[in-house]
Amino acid sequence: MNLNKYIDHTLLKPQATEEDIKKICKEAKEYNFASVCVNTCYTSLVSKELEGTDVTTCVVVGFPLGATTTETKAFEAKQAIEQGAGEVDMVINVGALKSKKYDYVKKDIEAVVEAAKGKALVKVILENCLLEKEEIVKACELSKEAGADFVKTSTGFSTGGAKVEDVKLMRETVGPDMGVKASGAVRTKEDAEAVIAAGANRIGASSSIAIVEGTKSENAGY
């Protein structure tokens, strides 16, 4: 199985330098990954580095807590898209979901979807490790209703990452027409193949090269 185009080559650590970002862009071009996923302050840099390739600039919005206001998320997405982002991974408002404020959660997602319309894909990070199974299902349903393109397991910055059973549940809930992204704790070729078999069609990883080469990863976390 060719895993390269499944992978969003990711660097979200706060201590990442410009040189680190340029390095992952170079790797993404060399290995022809799907995208490079970074914090929004690096959108312009990554877009410039990836110019003329089919590797997309992917950014995270409302990251990692999802607790910024809806207007803030929409602005962050809009600005990043103007700077060249083709994919936006936004974090759901976990507290609002747990408070059963479903209308708020849906509108929060819709605002980012609206900002991205026709210009960028939107992936909704659910942060499954903080959710009960029924909350994962509800979050998937709300994301689909809001018009998002993908649901995503995790930020990689909380208490857990992608689990095969969660990916399976997400795929069953959203059906065949929506993307499912597994991120956090996907560090080996075997991990990647397991989440793909469960229904993922995108993977967020910092261990991307180890995954495609079938070697041992030195990266913990994402």
Swiss-Prot record:
GO terms for molecular function: deoxyribose-phosphate aldolase activity. The keyword rRNA processing does not apply. Its EC number is 4.1.2.4. Keywords: Cytoplasm, Lyase, Schiff base. SUPFAM superfamilies: Aldolase (SSF51569). The active site is at D89 (proton donor/acceptor), K152 (schiff-base intermediate with acetaldehyde), K181 (proton donor/acceptor). CDD domains: DeoC. The keyword Cytoplasm applies. Pfam families: DeoC. InterPro entries: Aldolase_TIM, DeoC, DeoC/FbaB/LacD_aldolase, DeoC_typeI. One of its GO terms (biological process) is deoxyribonucleotide catabolic process. Pathway: Carbohydrate degradation; 2-deoxy-D-ribose 1-phosphate degradation; D-glyceraldehyde 3-phosphate and acetaldehyde from 2-deoxy-alpha-D-ribose 1-phosphate: step 2/2. PANTHER family: DEOXYRIBOSE-PHOSPHATE ALDOLASE. This is Deoxyribose-phosphate aldolase. The gene is deoC.
